[in-house]
Amino acid sequence: MPNLLLTMWDTIKSSNIGILVAAGLGMFAIIGGLSMLSYHYTLSGIKSRTVGDGQHGTARWATDKEIRKTYAHVPFKVRDWRKGVSLPTEQGLVLGCKGKKDELTALVDSDDIHCLMIAASGAGKTAFFLYPNLEYACASGMSFLALDTKGDLARNYGSIAKKHYGYKHISVIDLRNPTRSDGNNLLTLINRYMDIARKQPDNLAARAKAEKYAKILAKSIVSPEGNSDHGQNAFFYDAAEGLLSSTILLLAEFLPPDEEHPEERRHIVSVFKLVQDLLEPARGARGRSRFQLLMDKLPSEHKARWLAGAALNSSEQAMASVMSTVLSRLNSFLDSELEQILCFDSAIDAEKFAAEKSAIFLILPEEDQTKNFMAGLMIQNLSRELFAVADENGGKLKNRVILFCDELGTMPPFDILPLFSAGRSRRLTMVPIIQSVDQLVKNYGKEGASILMDNCQDVICGGFAPNSEAADAFSKALGSRTVLSGSVSRGKNDPSQSLQMMERPLLTADELKSIPKGCFIVQKTGCHPMRTRLRLFLEWGITFEEEYRVEEQAARRVYYADQNALTRAIVRKYPPKLTEQKATRSVKGEGQLHDAPVQEMVVAEDIDYDRMPHKRTPYNLPRQEVDR
């Protein structure tokens, strides 16, 4: 029995010793490990993860849930769409995608927005952004205008829009090859409504529309950059707008095609010719120009006479300055190649463009900058006409319209800011595409560039050049977040590590410059930014078919209006009349009619005083100016 007790005691004693030994070894390992760790603090162990409570910034990326809530997710099925199956109902811009090749889902912003795209040359603006958006625009039935510097958009998508998506109105305005271009007569809508008003004299609405579109066109030509820089010369520019509107209305009203002249003479080049001819001083009427005599032949209540009132009631020198201002603004249209486009009727006008599925491709020659003004004029004039159409339909267009303004930074400045502020609520979406923000600063000034960017609810950027300063600006715009930072110090016996919070940009300029091709950053008003990818058009399932081409046309003859024909047309419609008393005095030779107003004088249309044997005026009839 004692032996058994001794054995049990030895067992208990040995087990306690083992436990004590194990505990001692464990404590030694822990202390040794901590000691070893204290000697091995590394800076690489400090990660820049988000910490704190936004002390230095709260910028972050949008979550998947937020992306699903903000952007419409539309399966991008090109093959089905081109067969008329499963066409999308959401109209908007494609700003990203998810999924794998040929099974992509597009991220579409269907809100009323403008979108600014910033990408350097070669970043894939056409292949990654424009082609998917043009395909989606066709599938969802939106009308669009696309500026095309290379001509690829027109060649590749003209036939697709017409053949697969039922676009009946497709216009290619080729400033590089005018003989392969559709017409673009700036007076198309004015002529149309004036023809209706002429056939239906009681149709006040038609005449009012003609006058409205004439004033829109005159403002776009005389003040392409707006009225802000006119200063003390504001009178001359305002009077020039009125005089140009008046001339356009006279041309549209009195010189339509007829049996004698079946050709269309009502175009912008004829307007220049008329103003130039009417600027000359009138023969036999000292101190008066031909334009003043022409206006005297109109009834006192004619709107063309009222529109030109500021110029007519100014001094001779001031009126000459006003007409010279008009001529200087019209000089840009004097080009034999441009005449092949400007002097023939347009295939599409603003009303068709807004009501039906339509596409306009404007091809700009990169090698000839002198024709770039046409792009600004077309955008400005078309937008203002669309605003007028929207106002007649409750303030919104029936169908969304998108203007893809590629290479906007290389075009001359024009009054584009009102288009951004007024277009969004009318379902008109502007998509300016630039290479650098500095292009906007150069053309529109620092304030203008800032206003333009502030009016863009979406900004998409990518493909920054290695030395681009735009990356710094965009990095600042993305904001900052609060991240972990720290330091490690090593002493002889007591190494230490300290941690703190610091500010870090959401993406640094270096990170922006190293974004792979096809990857973009999207910012939207009221939302966190999104990192997205736009794949190459082939991966979207987009394929091209036969090229769309406008048939080659030989140089067409251009017909111009002249002031003689205009004068005869006015006199035929509003023949001058003599009062009975003055007519009697004239017949009896009781005196000259020197005091008779010019519009009451008898006009001898068939008399050419320069060819008469003598140039003396009969004593009983004042010599009249013969406008030929």
Regions found by a protein language model. Give the residues of each.
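A short glycine-/small-residue-rich loop at the edge of a beta-strand within enzyme catalytic domains
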Residues: R68, A72, R82, F373, ...
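Basic- and hydrophobic-enriched, low-structure N-terminal and domain-boundary segments
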Residues: M1-A123, A127-E135, S140, T179, ...
